[in-house]
Amino acid sequence: LESKILQDFNCSEFIYCSDSGLGSAANRRFNSLGNRAYIITHSLKKMKKEDREIALNPTQFRKVGSTKFIDLRTLDETDEEVYNTVYYKEVPVVTGNMDETLIVTYSPKYKAYQRRIRDRQIEHAEKIINTPGRKRKGKNQNDPMRFVKKTSVTPDGEIANKQVYNIDEEQIQKEEMYDGFYAVITNLEGDV
């Protein structure tokens, strides 16, 4: 696609923006040649564990326009100004021979939004558990069934005749750690 744009529009410069589905390393490499650049959404969940821990570490965030570092754990998210502010941090990343910057944002408002949605999905999952009948498997990241855990063995490890369904608290905790966070990766240089 980018090659076609270069040919058809005779562009000498452009910034490629996409979601992570079109953000492969090969696409990023191509879009770092010449006077091209890119900004691509980046999945925090799919990052290597050590990189994800750095990205989600609550220290070294800033408000846009400020050089002062903020520890997200110190925020009073009930304060309206804090609630409506987006915080960010930049993490240098080297992918092969490409120097990139991961920009991680945190928004208390986005966190609250994600929690409201998940709470409704958990309520739906509880209704499914309490409704007699066969249970289906969760199909995607928005399916309430992803919060349902099926147990088919007894605590002693014996095979059970009956399957027991419960809310999967571990799955809820895994998802909660990403609440409020969003990331993009770019090769653009300069101030955020």
Predicted segments, located by residue:
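Anion-binding and metal-coordination hotspots
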Residues: 1-192
